[in-house]
A protein has these predicted regions:
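Classical Sec-dependent N-terminal signal peptides that target proteins to the secretory pathway
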Residues: 1-21
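Non-catalytic tandem-repeat scaffold regions and their flanking low-complexity/translocation tails
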Residues: 21-248
């Protein structure tokens, strides 16, 4: 009898609490607790806990608004919202990366490459910024550009379009600014290219270091070492800037 009584009490408690009162961690400091949506310890006033979902880094959407880091993004018409990929979304013919509008993006050809990169027929974007819009280099056909498998490595990128293979380096200009420099990899077979690490790539005939052929290398015995350097049967290839290449 006592067991039956305890079960009834437990069921009544659960019925009164309800699922809406159970704390739920959505991620990136967002949570739902007691029918309220929180960012950290702050209540997001007006946010709907029944429809709130995390759609990107610190990016939350419900049936009325989109929030970034706990702040409502202005001028969003939620009925026209479309998620394009993690961190990228569209609203009223405007493309956004997180909370930033991508100026002059081509809506028709826009495509998300991964959570931090996208493209349209004119540009490649990191976040909301075009990486090929300066004199640091150009990608001949952005519309057909794709990253190579394993081609996104920290500040180093490898990709190709229907014409060329590209080595893309993000270089620090000073303590606060960086810029992408884009180099066409010459004489490479774009249909046989393979990324070995952030310094070395290869095709069916040659090994390339930061986008340039390593001359005199023994192709068949070349391998990448655990520390990232390379070696063949004759010597080791230690990473240094291009004007200081050293082999032993």
């Amino acid at each position: 009898m006592k067991k039956i009584f305890l079960k009834i009490v437990l069921l009544l408690i659960l019925a009164n609490v309800g699922f809406g009162d159970i704390a739920q961690n959505l991620g990136d400091y967002y949570s739902i607790n007691k029918g309220k949506v929180y960012y950290g310890n702050e209540i997001l006033e007006g946010a709907n806990p029944k429809t709130a979902e995390l759609i990107g880094f610190s990016l939350l959407k419900d049936d009325k608004n989109v929030y970034y880091m706990g702040k409502k993004i202005k001028d969003v018409k939620i009925k026209n919202f479309e998620k394009l990929g993690k961190n990228y979304w569209k609203n009223d013919n405007k493309i956004y990366y997180r909370d930033e509008k991508i100026e002059n993006a081509d809506i028709i050809s826009f495509k998300v490459l991964n959570e931090d990169y996208a493209k349209d027929k004119n540009h490649i974007y990191r976040g909301s910024e075009a990486i090929d819009s300066s004199l640091s280099g150009k990608i001949k056909d952005p519309e057909t550009f794709e990253f190579l498998p394993n081609g996104i490595i920290y500040g180093t990128l490898y990709g190709k379009d229907k014409y060329n293979v590209y080595y893309i380096k993000n270089k620090m200009l000073n303590c606060f600014d960086s810029s992408y420099f884009i180099y066409e990899v010459k004489r490479i077979n774009k249909d046989k290219v393979e990324v070995l690490n952030n310094w070395f790539i290869k095709d069916d005939k040659n090994i390339y270091f930061e986008g340039e052929i390593l001359e005199g290398l023994d192709y068949n015995t070349f391998e990448v070492l655990p520390n990232g350097d390379g070696k063949d049967k004759n010597r080791s290839y230690e990473y240094l800037p291009k004007d200081e290449w050293r082999w032993f």
